[in-house]
A protein has these predicted regions:
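ABC transporter nucleotide-binding domain
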Residues: 173-269
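Hydrophobic/anchoring residues in structured secondary elements
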Residues: 9, 254-257, 296
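Conserved protein kinase catalytic domain
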Residues: 73, 117, 172, 219, ...
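A generic structural signal for secondary-structure junctions
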Residues: 77, 103, 142, 202, ...
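C-terminal coupling/interaction segments
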Residues: 268-341
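ABC transporter nucleotide-binding domains
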Residues: 2-4, 9-206, 210-211
Length: 341
């Protein structure tokens, strides 16, 4: 559905997006995850035709966003980080304007307006001035305009930023509902949000794609999945002697507890936690010692995110680039209004 190849965006010497390549398939919900200033908004603005790349291509259902902008943009509904709303209008007036700008008219426009108003839950406020609406309702109106024109792909940039907890839950539920009939891509830096909604996760850091997979697969791949904590009454030197004889262990650290037990955190070279656990029980038993408790630590999306983004930070040139990246990220997110073919 969407093919991004070798996408790069420079602002002078600063690289906001660095050689991004990925493919988005039909009918799934994708989370675009990264810290502030990572390049998420810049990438989304390029994908939607609001910003030109320095190099690289974006194709929407086979249509190049630069060479065939009208055909490509007809397939996209976009909500920028700052919703492009006209606050002197009512939601109904605003949606009529957007629909006509997208080439939808007459009975079909009214049908689509009725549908998106129902879907986004703004029927009760459709005749109030947008300037009087809460942040949550403004986000809903922004999503409603993205849905006009019957696009196949919905792209949402930080759709829950600035909302209260109830509004966040409502927008998340709306995204799940949209995912039943559309391909949805939304950006966030909130890990729990991405984990609870998305079927696929793209993690971007310093403008580079560092991971792209299902959340569950990412969790399985990273370090904490090979971490085991053992609780025992054996002495620390005895534990060291036992663990040195267990194959497949890379490192361990012992901590004395108030009840006289020893807590031992063990990092394994293999991710086969069952096999490592079996070896540990056997080794302790053979030495006449007992394992009172054994816990396998499973990675979550937060572990994956921190490890990947910290690796990128170590290669960064310094905090000045971070600030510059945020400045360009914010600037690029302001460059787009309503997408009109």
């Amino acid at each position: 559905m969407i093919v991004v190849e070798h996408l790069t965006k420079h602002y002078g010497d600063f690289v906001a997006v660095n050689d991004l390549s990925f493919e988005i398939q039909d009918g799934r919900v994708y989370g675009f995850l990264g810290p502030n200033g990572a390049g998420k908004s810049t990438t989304m603005n390029i994908m939607t035709g609001c910003l030109s790349p320095t190099s690289g291509t974006v194709r929407i259902d086979g249509h190049d966003i630069l060479k065939e902008p009208e055909a490509a943009k007809r397939l996209i509904g976009y909500l920028p980080e700052r919703p492009p709303l006209y606050t002197s209008e009512t939601p109904a007036e605003y949606l009529q304007f957007v629909g006509e700008a997208k080439g939808v008219k007459g009975p079909e426009l009214q049908r689509q307006m009725d549908e998106v108003i129902r879907l986004t839950g703004i029927d009760q406020v459709k005749d109030r001035l947008i300037s009087t609406l809460s942040k949550g309702y403004c986000q809903r109106v922004g999503i409603a305009q993205a849905l006009l024109g019957a696009p196949k792909v919905i792209i949402l940039d930080e759709p829950t930023v600035g909302l209260d907890p109830i509004q966040i839950i409502e927008i998340r539920d709306l995204i799940r509902e949209l995912g039943k009939t559309h391909t949805v891509i939304f950006s966030s830096h909130i890990l729990s949000e991405v984990q609870s909604i998305c079927e696929q996760v793209l993690i971007i850091s310093k403008g580079s794609l560092v991971a792209f997979d299902e959340p569950e697969n990412l969790e399985k791949l990273f370090t904490q999945s090979g971490s085991i904590v053992v609780r025992t009454r054996a002495a620390a030197d005895t534990v060291d002697s036992i663990l040195k004889r267990v194959p497949g262990l890379s490192e361990w650290a012992s901590t004395a507890q108030a009840d006289g037990c020893l807590s031992v955190s063990i990092r394994a070279e293999t991710q086969d936690s069952y096999e490592i656990s079996r070896r540990l029980f056997f080794a302790f038993s053979e030495s006449g010692e007992a394992i009172l408790e054994l816990t396998v630590k499973r990675a979550n999306l937060e572990d994956v995110f921190l490890e990947l983004t910290e690796e990128q930070e170590h290669s960064a040139t310094g905090t000045q680039d971070n600030a510059l990246g945020q400045t360009h990220e914010e600037a690029s997110s302001d460059e787009c209004e309503v997408i009109v073919p």
